[in-house]
Amino acid sequence: MNLHQFRFVREAVRQNFNLTEAAKALYTSQPGVSKAIIELEDELGVEIFTRHGKRVRSLTEPGRIILASVERILQEVESLKRVGKDYAAQDQGNLTIAATHTQARYSLPAAIAEFKKRFPKVHLSILQGSPTQVAEMVIHDQADLAIATEAISDYKELVSLPCFQWHHAAVVPADHPLLERKPVTLDDLAQYPLITYDDAFAGRKKINHAFALRGLSPDIVLEAIDADVIKTYVELGLGVGIMADIAFNPERDRGLRLIPVGHLFGSNVTRVALKQGAYLRSYVYTLVELLSPTLNRKLIEQALKGEAESYEL
């Protein structure tokens, strides 16, 4: 048995049991993948996959147990590689961050700027996606950490820690009647067409829930995945924007005004997610600490080992 066989098993599952796609992902041949998996099954004395003819269909019951072991072994192998790299070069390497647009655009820049001052030789990559997508990037080892508000705390494969709180705000043109309402109510907002986030982003469920509790059905004329799009269409007069307050910049958004509405929708928590049991290079801890001063290396290490008590802001 060898690591290549383990990788073939894992990739077959990731590719929805399509061995041709698994072979492409691992830059090898489909017959080679099929043969290696059969040899592993023969050595273990059990079938890992159910088959219909020559086609792999699903995991068998022992296959599920084997997959869990394979995942752990391959993660440990990656951790060993990182340990070696860490000690060979403490202040250089690669760091990939997966983040939603709002976090990449508004939360990360200050932390990244300070990080690059401290670690100029570390190559940074930022991948953007939905909360679900960035979580899966970490799970599948495509990113070292994920930053988002939703979804990332829902995966058992991840450890998520709170970074900071933020609230929703209404954004309107400088002469909008809502600026005269203090405080703004849900009934006030419901009088206007609304522009806000897609259902998968930035606390949209809280917005929907608040209106539903009030018995209101707001006219949401446009949904977007980032705040810049929301602000653009507010400027065009299409409606009132509801977005994260951290995405408003008075200097850049001079034609708009921000109205706090946190009292209507409650607070939201941006979280950083790391893979359960992962080995992190020292500079990853530094970046997490820059994102949230309330976090430190000891707390992060305890959380990764499952030793930390539930920690919230």
Curated annotation (Swiss-Prot):
Gene ablation phenotype (knockout): Mutant is not able to utilize sulfate, sulfite and ethanesulfonate for cysteine biosynthesis.
GO biological process assignments: cysteine biosynthetic process
Family classification: Belongs to the LysR transcriptional regulatory family.
Free-text function comment from the UniProt entry: Transcriptional regulator preferentially involved in the control of sulfate transport and reduction. Binds to DNA at target promoter regions.
NCBIfam families the record matches: PRK12684.1
Origin species: Burkholderia cenocepacia (strain ATCC BAA-245 / DSM 16553 / LMG 16656 / NCTC 13227 / J2315 / CF5610) (Burkholderia cepacia (strain J2315))
GO MF entry, a single one: transcription cis-regulatory region binding
InterPro entries: CysB_PBP2, LysR_subst-bd, Tscrpt_reg_HTH_LysR, WH-like_DNA-bd_sf, WH_DNA-bd_sf
Binding region for DNA: 19-38
HTH lysR-type domain span: 1-59
Description of what induces expression: Negatively controlled by both CysB and SsuR.
CDD domains: PBP2_CysB_like
The entry's keywords: DNA-binding, Transcription, Transcription regulation
Pfam families: HTH_1, LysR_substrate
Keyword Transcription regulation: yes
Keyword Nucleotidyltransferase: no
Leader peptide range in chain numbering: none
Designated name of the protein: HTH-type transcriptional regulator CysB
